[in-house]
Amino acid sequence: MVITALARAKINLTLDVLGKRPDGYHEVEMVMQSIELHDRLEFRPCAAGGISLAVEGADLPPGKENLVYRAAELLRAAGGVRAGAEIRLKKAIPVAAGLGGGSADAAAALVALNEMWNTGFSPAGLMELAEQLGSDVPFGLMGGTALARGRGERLERLFPCPPLGLVLVKPPFGVSTAEVYRAFKPGLNPKKADAQAMVRAIKKGDAADIAACLGNALEPVTVKMYPEVAEIKKKLMEAGALGALMAGSGPTVFGLTADLESARQVAARYRRTDEQILVTRTFNPRL
């Protein structure tokens, strides 16, 4: 028995930081969107018990430091499972890029292993486990288009975003999300990330309106640390993107276009140096 699962990356169409919480996390409000770029995971039962994880395509730890491994251990303990699993993770989503790849992988592991081990957790039960693993893991379970609040775990499904083209540009370095949040100070970004304006633009379905509502309160923080992020945005706009925004805490920047063919044209015109460029589009399971 082999179960295959796809773990889709995400972008934040808006990201606003509302303040620091008593638990040390930051209160956020975000419009989150799944994209077609994905990792692939394969799961096989292991009667001898134990969990093994093999990673291809990225230099990631295969043990307890890996979120997929921790997701498997958490579900195994919560479900009282004695059997084990052999997991193969094939990475396509860039690591430490602001695209939520690790969280998506963990969410995919919860769903697949819940089926393979027959642990019987409901979607709500899996959501509770996902919250224990990380702020973005619950969205990895939901997917599509969603408004996220709290530290990112309180989700409201939104009207689905229309299919839009995306050019992802990842510079040759990673960014620490914790470091970016530590450096955040209110008022750094003159343009407010307006989630409600984005929700209205998505309902209207016009790519230019959606592009006009893009906003990320963390962008000025990362740009101060890594000015290359601002240069990537500039080059994407010069190449013809309708809008450009840093994904999450960075350093990946995405250029938004009306469709996939337009994204390919922007990628071809982009003045590339040493960045990784990926062309993809938004994804919604209901479209």
Swiss-Prot record:
Annotated SUPFAM superfamilies: GHMP Kinase, C-terminal domain, Ribosomal protein S5 domain 2-like
The reaction(s) this protein catalyses: 4-CDP-2-C-methyl-D-erythritol + ATP = 4-CDP-2-C-methyl-D-erythritol 2-phosphate + ADP + H(+)
Catalytic machinery residues: K10, D136
Pfam families assigned: GHMP_kinases_C, GHMP_kinases_N
Known pathway: Isoprenoid biosynthesis; isopentenyl diphosphate biosynthesis via DXP pathway; isopentenyl diphosphate from 1-deoxy-D-xylulose 5-phosphate: step 3/6
InterPro entries associated with the record: GHMP_kinase_C_dom, GHMP_kinase_C_sf, GHMP_kinase_N_dom, IspE, Ribosomal_Su5_D2-typ_SF, Ribsml_uS5_D2-typ_fold_subgr
Residues that coordinate or bind ATP: P94, V95, A96, A97, G98, L99, G100, G101, G102, S103, A104
EC top class, as a word: transferase
Keyword line: ATP-binding, Isoprene biosynthesis, Kinase, Nucleotide-binding, Transferase
GO terms, molecular function: 4-(cytidine 5'-diphospho)-2-C-methyl-D-erythritol kinase activity; ATP binding
EC number: 2.7.1.148
Biological processes, Gene Ontology terms: isopentenyl diphosphate biosynthetic process, methylerythritol 4-phosphate pathway; terpenoid biosynthetic process
Entries under Gene3D superfamilies matching the protein: 3.30.230.10, GHMP kinase, C-terminal domain
Function noted in UniProt: Catalyzes the phosphorylation of the position 2 hydroxy group of 4-diphosphocytidyl-2C-methyl-D-erythritol.
Family, per entry: Belongs to the GHMP kinase family. IspE subfamily.
Name recorded for this polypeptide: 4-diphosphocytidyl-2-C-methyl-D-erythritol kinase
Protein's organism: Pelotomaculum thermopropionicum (strain DSM 13744 / JCM 10971 / SI)
